[in-house]
Amino acid sequence: MIPYATVEEASIALGRNLTRLETLWFDYSATKSDYYLYCHNILFLFLVFSLVPLPLVFVELARSASGLFNRYKIQPKVNYSLSDMFKCYKDVMTMFILVVGPLQLVSYPSIQMIEIRSGLPLPTITEMLSQLVVYFLIEDYTNYWVHRFFHSKWGYDKIHRVHHEYTAPIGYAAPYAHWAEVLLLGIPTFMGPAIAPGHMITFWLWIALRQMEAIETHSGYDFPWSPTKYIPFYGGAEYHDYHHYVGGQSQSNFASVFTYCDYIYGTDKGYRFQKKLLEQIKESSKKSNKHNGGIKSD
């Protein structure tokens, strides 16, 4: 809660006039508790889980009906009906209601402990972006090791096998997981803000962006126009799809966001080998077609 009764008091305390965004933030949050602001994450996660994968539903239905977008489908032999995707969404919402939502309600003391602030001044764009980069890097590294644990025999059989029920991922399957996996993967997500605490708005943005990234990674489509193609060392849908395609025995492509951990620790060899093999097959096919096209019958 902002400790100022008026905008004028806040301006005097800061030694300057509030920006337009700071004034809007003051008007909205001044009388609200930090706990109430933190619980906004429940609404944001619900909207992300519900709306962000929705365009992929229409893409999948259009592809199944007419072949449109087929060239971008990573596993084109796998088709999902509307009922298949709605069932996945219902399962995710059940987990959201029973686990994710209650976890948000009871985890506020951890936010107090790491001192996520909600007052003024608001963070600058540079501050927010730098913190988000740090959060993604920390989450990626810690998630890598948690994910490797999930692919131990015990971790997979008892927990992670649920997430791998979708060998060809779809957007709604990104948060589809065992309740224990949801809880354990909250640790890597929380590590960044714990190490470099910022503003509540930055925290909201981090939680939303991380889930949006997971949905893109599980989209099942490799769109060449995706802006994530320009992010250095970004894995993306094609990279993570291989992990699901191989299945429970996969010891490759554990990274959640970037590819550097898999490269450093040698857990991308199967993926690199398959990719190189497919490129050789395509090249051989092109040469064969070119050769056959150049042969003229008498």
From Swiss-Prot:
Key word Transmembrane helix present: yes
Main subcellular location of this protein, as a coarse class: endoplasmic reticulum
Motif residue range(s): Histidine box-1: 147-151
Pfam families recorded: FA_hydroxylase (PF04116)
Alphabetized UniProt keyword annotations: Endoplasmic reticulum, Iron, Lipid biosynthesis, Lipid metabolism, Membrane, Monooxygenase, Oxidoreductase, Steroid biosynthesis, Steroid metabolism, Sterol biosynthesis, Sterol metabolism, Transmembrane, Transmembrane helix
Binding partners and assembly: Interacts with ACBP1.
Domains: entry comment: The histidine box domains may contain the active site and/or be involved in metal ion binding.
Protein name (Swiss-Prot/TrEMBL): Methylsterol monooxygenase 1-1
Lineage: Eukaryota, Viridiplantae, Streptophyta, Embryophyta, Tracheophyta
Name of the gene encoding the protein in the UniProt record: SMO1-1
